[in-house]
Amino acid sequence: FVHWYVGEGMEEGEFSEAREDLAALEKDYEEVGIETAEAEGEEEGYGEEL
């Protein structure tokens, strides 16, 4: 499929850059999900200690 986009004027480097950007975005979402799950776990455990 890349050759179609290159034929329309895109550069191949743009695909690599987009792939890296998506990988970074996915990693950010995973980190936020982990932090959110940890924060929810702390909130649930807070009331049990009293």
Curated annotation (Swiss-Prot):
A single GO molecular function term of this UniProt record: hydrolase activity
Class of the enzyme per the UniProt entry, highest EC level: hydrolase
Main localization, broad class: cytoplasm
UniProt entry keywords in alphabetical sequence: Cytoplasm, Cytoskeleton, GTP-binding, Hydrolase, Microtubule, Nucleotide-binding
InterPro entries: Tub_FtsZ_C, Tubulin, Tubulin_C
Swiss-Prot/TrEMBL cofactor(s): Mg(2+)
EC id: 3.6.5.-
BP-aspect Gene Ontology terms: microtubule-based process
Coiled-coil intervals, chain numbering: none
Keyword GTP-binding: yes
Subcellular location: Cytoplasm, Cytoskeleton
Reaction catalysis annotation: GTP + H2O = GDP + phosphate + H(+)
GO cellular component: cytoplasm; microtubule
Subunit structure: Dimer of alpha and beta chains. A typical microtubule is a hollow water-filled tube with an outer diameter of 25 nm and an inner diameter of 15 nM. Alpha-beta heterodimers associate head-to-tail to form protofilaments running lengthwise along the microtubule wall with the beta-tubulin subunit facing the microtubule plus end conferring a structural polarity. Microtubules usually have 13 protofilaments but different protofilament numbers can be found in some organisms and specialized cells.
Protein function: Tubulin is the major constituent of microtubules, a cylinder consisting of laterally associated linear protofilaments composed of alpha- and beta-tubulin heterodimers. Microtubules grow by the addition of GTP-tubulin dimers to the microtubule end, where a stabilizing cap forms. Below the cap, tubulin dimers are in GDP-bound state, owing to GTPase activity of alpha-tubulin.
Assigned protein family: Belongs to the tubulin family.
Stated name of the protein: Tubulin alpha chain
Organism lineage: Eukaryota, Sar, Alveolata, Ciliophora, Postciliodesmatophora
